[in-house]
């Protein structure tokens, strides 16, 4: 399954939902260059079959981006997205650390009294994204620092929509993140203005 090349002519497209299409990989045409005005990208539930243990199944063409060799780093470089949904797929491997990506600068952090010092020097990944969902994939390894201290992490309902994985990978690993925090107490130590804000939003 692939998107037609003419999709790239939709330069003014702002919202794209291609969930439930059984893609084996994320279509190459999906780039910020092809969709400069896109702010919401939904790629959820592309599984053709529901397979809990990928190491114990020989079916082909099962969808769920199962042929992606690793987590699609290029999607994480799409800075204009405010919504990114990748839930209920077969993405495997670790979340990339994005060490070569643009970093938060001291000037940016000091210009906003709601941003903590710990951000300085961390990769500035998906800075505008208020909805980020990668739950029910087959991800493993460590959660990267750019995610653990992301300014909008609390808006992402991380224990439901980010940290929660399921099943086993193709090589038989149990899924889940080795450094999943027990709570967000560490986070609110760096974002004290958020903890008692009922909407979990930083003050403008």
Which positions does each model-derived feature cover?
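The feature encodes a structural signal of leucine-rich repeats
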Residues: 3-6, 26-31, 51-55, 68-73, ...
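Leucine-rich repeat
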Residues: 9-12, 32-38, 57, 77-80, ...
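Conserved hydrophobic beta-strand positions in leucine-rich repeat
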Residues: 13-18, 38-43, 60-61, 82-86, ...
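Consensus "Asn ladder" position of solenoid repeat domains
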Residues: 21, 46, 64, 89, ...
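Acidic/polar low-complexity surface segments
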Residues: 45-66, 101-112, 117
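Exposed regions on extracellular, virion, or secretory-pathway luminal proteins
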Residues: 68-71, 102-124, 167-180, 192
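Leucine-rich solenoid repeat scaffolds
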Residues: 126-203
């Amino acid at each position: 399954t692939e998107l037609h090349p003419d999709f790239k002519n939709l330069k003014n497209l702002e919202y794209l939902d291609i969930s439930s299409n059984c893609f084996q990989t994320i279509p190459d045409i999906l780039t910020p260059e092809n969709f400069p005005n896109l702010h919401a990208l939904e790629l959820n539930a592309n599984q053709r079959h529901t397979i809990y243990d990928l190491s114990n199944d020989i079916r082909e063409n099962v969808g769920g981006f199962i042929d992606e060799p690793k987590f699609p780093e290029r999607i994480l470089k799409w800075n204009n997205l405010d919504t990114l949904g990748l839930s209920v797929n077969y993405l495997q491997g670790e979340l990339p650390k994005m060490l070569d990506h643009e970093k938060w600068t001291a000037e940016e952090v000091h210009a906003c009294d709601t941003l903590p010092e710990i951000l300085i020097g961390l990769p500035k990944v998906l800075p505008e994204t208020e909805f980020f969902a990668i739950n029910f994939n087959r991800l493993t390894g460590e959660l990267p620092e750019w995610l653990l201290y992301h300014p909008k992490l609390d808006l992402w309902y991380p224990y439901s929509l980010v940290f929660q994985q399921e099943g086993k990978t193709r090589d038989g690993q149990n899924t889940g993140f080795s450094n999943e925090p027990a709570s967000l107490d560490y986070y609110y130590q760096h974002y004290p203005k958020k903890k008692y804000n009922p909407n979990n939003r930083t003050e403008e």
